[in-house]
Amino acid sequence: MQNFTFFASCAKGIELLLKDELDALGISSSEKLAGVEFEGSFEDAYKVCIYSHLASQVMLKIATQKVTDQQALYDFISSINWLDYFDVNTAFKIIISGKHYDFNNTMFVSQKTKDAIVDQFRRETNERPNIDTDNPDNIIKLHLHKQYVNVFLCLNIESLHKRSYRQFQGQAPLKESLAAAILIKAGWLDELKKEQPILIDPMCGSGTILIEAALMAKNIAPVLLNKEFKLFNSKLHDEDLWNNLLEIAKKAQKPTNAIIQGYDIDNNVLDKADRNIYQAGVEDVVNIKRQDIRDLENELESEGLIVTNPPYGERLYGDQLDELLDIFNGFGDRLSQDFYGWKVAILTSFDESIKEMQLRTTKKNKFYNGAIETVLYQFDINEHARFKHESQLEKNIRLAEASALKSDEHIDFSNKLKKNLKNLKPWLKQSGVECYRLYDADIPTFAVAVDIYGEHVFLQEYRADATIDQNIAKQRFYQAIYQIHKTLDIQYENIHTRVRQRQKGKEQYQKNNDRNNFHVINEFNAKFYVNFDDYLDTGIFLDHRKIRQLVAKASKNKTLLNLFSYTCTASVHAALKGAKTTSVDMSNTYLEWGKNNFELNNLDIKKHNFIQADCISWLKSNSEKFDVIFLDPPTFSNSKRMDDILDIQRDHELLINLAMDSLKKDGVLYFSNNYRRFKMSQEIIAKFNCENIDKVCLSRDFLSNKNIHNCWEIKYKK
């Protein structure tokens, strides 16, 4: 059986769901923008037309070519043998999507395409096919992308989302395919595996969600409901195969014991829903009745699923907005009081209504109902559902949204983020750096540092001066959260916050909480675990990026001693270059983290040393010599594990002398610290060859903070 390339289009946001749907049909596909592509036979393509609840169009890919002018476009379309696809006595229609660098006018592209096809038929048959934009036999689609033109032949003439059952609809109709998508995303397919599946739509409108749920429950192929469905009239079409597949689909229908219940307060829309349910032939499983959502009661003994698409706020309610918000407040009450154990999914573009419910969302997914951007909010109704104990994330979101309304100072912060990102982009592209500092208190009133870790942001608030009103400082902090979310398109849950201040004693090594949220990042050829929530720092110091590279380069196939090694990131880089490493740190937690970093990079930890010890005490007793030493002590430490308090300005001379005692005569010591007022000991400068390498170690993303660290290269004098 010959294979072809097909594209199944869908609404933006449901591509992965469509891919899963095709997987269930035994068709392997790859996700693309607004659809999926798959290799297969016409039998596979027909199955998608018949069974897909989500696809809009199934298209045969005919050809793709780069074209740069109108003649090239004409020649490309002419090079396709259209007589292989349809007869001259069939009518066709051309549709254009996408954008092309050289063609601004899609009508021009359509006309050129039509001319090329018609001219070919005239040359070959002395006749021309008709153009029919209302009732074509075939649809030729051109998708434009950059300088490329992709040519498709559509298998279905009408969009697959049309099921024919919706004879009557309300003011804001929900597309059938989107209704199916939110049901799948909400977990209806899993619910159907239960002995007694239950679905309630408490604001059912004209019944689209209820009907789509019933089609899935009864295994009714959507195309069977489409009385006006029309396939392409192509020479490639296999009518016998199509009819055989339709018969198989009809026989696959089954009864169900699912309970599918709809409610609405409006008798007029309930009447429409009743007629639509009858048209769809699912009146045996779907029940509807009039009820105010604030009076919703659980009359069932087992848990189920609630899915609804309420009216979109001001668009339908206008001056009744206050009533709408009151409705949702009451809905939240009913859910938390009477639907324990249930799952709830609400599709809306009006987030104010969701806030009024006072329930914690477990998931949020963006969908499009035509051109309207909407969000599917999901909830688990349990003891944690109500806003009784507000999480830090929920608090951040609430205060961030509220702070944005109090003043417009944060606009400057937003503009600075945009400017910094624009300035850094060429460097980021050239260097391959994925984790970087975007902002570092560039605007005095927004005293925060913004570090980017892929899709996550680590936001550090510098402790406000005592003269600054703490309420104002806190408001600006939440405004910063708001603008990071809006400007950088970072999800609130991926914005991790910390207040920067001196930590004392064991605070330096203790967790903030016990979530154990580790993520993997890349730094050049190495991978590291980072944790944004559980510790005071993430597990990697971004400002040390360059000195880690220097240390690794110097340590190639040599021995490295990493003092105050933290999570052993410098050791990993060195080990990847063949170094044998010894990492010393007081914290067993960080050393274990370091071992995990080694294993993440497929490095054998048995070939490297990890020593939990006070570095000063260990250096005093050490007799081994190393080729390279990396000494990166904290500015201040008074941990009980240390014999004494460490003050880097006071103690660096002792530390360097001890480290040099463990260095080979031809070796090199890299010394770094973050004390801004640090002054190197004159005795050390006189005793050794000391070169300040601050500029060498300063990355592009830290140029605005040139005093962030002090870096020295120290060697024995020859």
UniProtKB/Swiss-Prot annotation:
GO cellular component, one term: cytoplasm
Span of domain THUMP: 44-155
Primary localization class, coarse: cytoplasm
Taxonomy, superkingdom: Bacteria
Annotated EC: 2.1.1.173, 2.1.1.264
Catalytic activity: guanosine(2445) in 23S rRNA + S-adenosyl-L-methionine = N(2)-methylguanosine(2445) in 23S rRNA + S-adenosyl-L-homocysteine + H(+); guanosine(2069) in 23S rRNA + S-adenosyl-L-methionine = N(2)-methylguanosine(2069) in 23S rRNA + S-adenosyl-L-homocysteine + H(+)
Molecular function, one GO term: RNA binding
Location in or out of the cell: Cytoplasm
Keywords per UniProt: Cytoplasm, Methyltransferase, RNA-binding, rRNA processing, S-adenosyl-L-methionine, Transferase
SMART domains assigned to the protein according to its UniProt record, in alphabetical order: THUMP
HAMAP family, sorted: 23SrRNA_methyltr_KL (MF_01858)
The protein's role, per its UniProt record: Specifically methylates the guanine in position 2445 (m2G2445) and the guanine in position 2069 (m7G2069) of 23S rRNA.
Membership in a protein family: Belongs to the methyltransferase superfamily. RlmKL family.
Protein name as catalogued: Ribosomal RNA large subunit methyltransferase K/L
